[in-house]
């Protein structure tokens, strides 16, 4: 728009000011110059295309944020459930929990929404449900849990220290439209109280339904542990139990034996002895139900316990055989020579 055009057309030189032809010509030239400047000037308008809620870009952005944030339900809000929840919340995930014991105050401190009633818990429709119960109570918990109130595509996980047992229960008891992921973080509140760097996380994708959404959800949950520094190990539940019997069960057994001895630090403790005390700290404070579950629900544990007992007897036998030889030599040395 030429804002000065009307003004220029209606403005006439004052007879008092422009009395001569030369003055009038000068005035006309000035007006013409202003008109020319207006014709050549351009109005530049710059604007940022801000995403609106109804834009496709905005919807894609919202979906992207939702894709990396999970609503995770914890069933069994004891020490291990609280241990995992704290990390999930710190990573930006929404965590809800339910348990037979009332942990409302603890949940508030951790930023977790706690539900006393399992039905109310399921009505929140978590993306992932993780059973953090004890090994011994898993079966009874599954019998009482209202799975029918969950969404049909819910991902169900466990973090038990044995894997074949929960796998079989899930396959037998859960509706077929549920996804199943068996997990075992090979650490706990004591051994994992600091960094999770290089700590093993064993997983078995027992049943993950078709569709990008289901695959991405499962992978994103696993990616959480990976970004925390865990060493990711994909392994069948059967192979896990075979290896765990000769590693985890033996570790807990030796730790409990040493804990029963009430070992304590001395002024001349060696690094080896400090390692034994660390083993006691990482195992002896776990509940006996956990240790008993490792024995009862791993079919390989009895064999490893027998091997441990046999190895101890062999070492003790070597000691006493050498001692008996020494005693015989001292008391019957001359007779033995003849």
Annotated model-derived regions:
Residues 264-338:
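Interdomain hinge/lid region at the active-site interface
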Residues 155, 159-196:
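Rossmann-fold NAD(P)-binding glycine/threonine-rich loop
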Residues 5, 116-155:
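Rossmann-like NAD(P)-binding element
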Residues 1-49:
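N-terminal chloroplast transit peptides
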């Amino acid at each position: 728009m030429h804002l000065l055009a009307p003004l220029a057309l209606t403005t006439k030189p004052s007879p008092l000011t422009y009395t001569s032809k030369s003055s009038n010509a000068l005035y006309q030239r000035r007006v013409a110059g202003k008109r020319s400047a207006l014709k050549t000037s351009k109005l530049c308008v710059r604007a940022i295309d801000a995403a609106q809620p109804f834009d496709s870009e905005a919807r894609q952005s919202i979906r992207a944020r939702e894709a990396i944030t999970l609503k995770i339900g914890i069933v069994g809000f004891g020490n291990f459930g609280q241990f995992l929840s704290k990390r999930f919340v710190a990573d930006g995930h929404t965590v809800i929990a339910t348990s037979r014991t009332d942990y409302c105050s603890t949940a508030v401190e951790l930023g977790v929404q706690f539900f006393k009633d399992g039905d109310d818990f399921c009505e929140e429709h978590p993306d992932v449900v993780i059973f953090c119960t004890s090994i011994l109570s898993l079966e009874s918990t599954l019998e009482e849990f209202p799975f029918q109130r969950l969404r049909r595509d819910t991902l169900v996980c466990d973090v038990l220290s044995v894997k074949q047992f929960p796998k079989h229960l899930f396959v037998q008891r859960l509706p077929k439209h549920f996804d199943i992921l068996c997990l075992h973080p090979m650490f706990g509140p004591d051994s994992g109280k600091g960094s999770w760097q290089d700590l093993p996380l064993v997983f078995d994708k027992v049943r993950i339904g078709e569709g990008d959404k289901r695959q991405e959800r499962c992978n994103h949950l696993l990616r959480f542990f990976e970004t925390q520094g865990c060493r990711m190990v994909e392994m069948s539940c059967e192979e896990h139990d075979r290896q765990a019997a000769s590693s985890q069960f033996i570790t807990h057994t030796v730790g409990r034996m040493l804990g029963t001895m009430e070992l304590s630090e001395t002024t001349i403790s060696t690094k080896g002895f400090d390692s034994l005390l660390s083993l006691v700290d990482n195992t002896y404070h776990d509940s006996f139900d956990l240790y008993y579950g490792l024995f009862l629900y791993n079919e390989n544990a009895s064999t490893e316990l027998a091997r441990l007992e046999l190895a101890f007897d062999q070492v003790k036998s070597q000691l006493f055989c050498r001692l008996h030889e020494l005693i015989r030599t001292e008391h019957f040395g001359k007779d033995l020579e003849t």
